[in-house]
């Protein structure tokens, strides 16, 4: 902008002898108008970029182009929900400074968000020590069950390695709990015109959240719901589908649901052949599943 203004001043100085005063005024006005338009465009782009860091980019674009409204702006779609949280984080906060806990949480959110987006998903919400992501929501994702599992596997592997060692604090280690399920949900904006929220609603969201909360009880860090297993084509006696080895853990009555649901996990969280795979298998063997009364 300063460059345009300087150029206008120089042009006016150079052309004093060749242009009439009216022409010089018109030229200066045109250059200043271009400068103002450029400044306005930069401000709009900055506002949009900042807004897109708080909500997903497609939602930010809609907000920027539409007037506020009291109406429901949502659509029904088939998608996969991935939710993940930090286990034992509340206890960790009691023994660490606010700066350390903020750094740990920031690193977790940043790394998990990057991995989710790299696999075709979008983070819809972050609250407390948890986040919720959607595959095939605002951004199309044809193979959303497989993409969500790949993202969950990467999060468990990479984000777990970034968690601080709590041994010196004498408390249980930080760990991750992940829940995934597929189904239909309403995704969009709700609320009054002066205070809107973008979220998703549906049983698939409840299922993913309850599966995540069940991970400590079952001692499996990642749990899959029946909707996701069905879309993968999992059948009794044939759990190996599309290079994803699924293990059926049994029937469980999840909180808030009326009927028991089949719960699954990945036999191997890491890619087959990974050096850490044997450590994962050893961990799972040392932490048996829930009491047999739950299994089916």
Regions found by a protein language model. Name each.
Residues 185, 215-296:
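Cytosolic regulatory/linker segments at or just downstream of nucleotide-handling modules
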